[in-house]
Amino acid sequence: VAAGRPRF
């Protein structure tokens, strides 16, 4: 998952 992003 991208750092600092929600896990959608």
From Swiss-Prot:
A single cellular component GO annotation: extracellular region
Residues the record lists as Phenylalanine amide modifications: 8
Keywords, ordered alphabetically: Amidation, Neuropeptide, Secreted
Entry's Gene Ontology BP terms: neuropeptide signaling pathway
Compartmental location: Secreted
Function: Neuropeptide.
Protein name: Long neuropeptide F
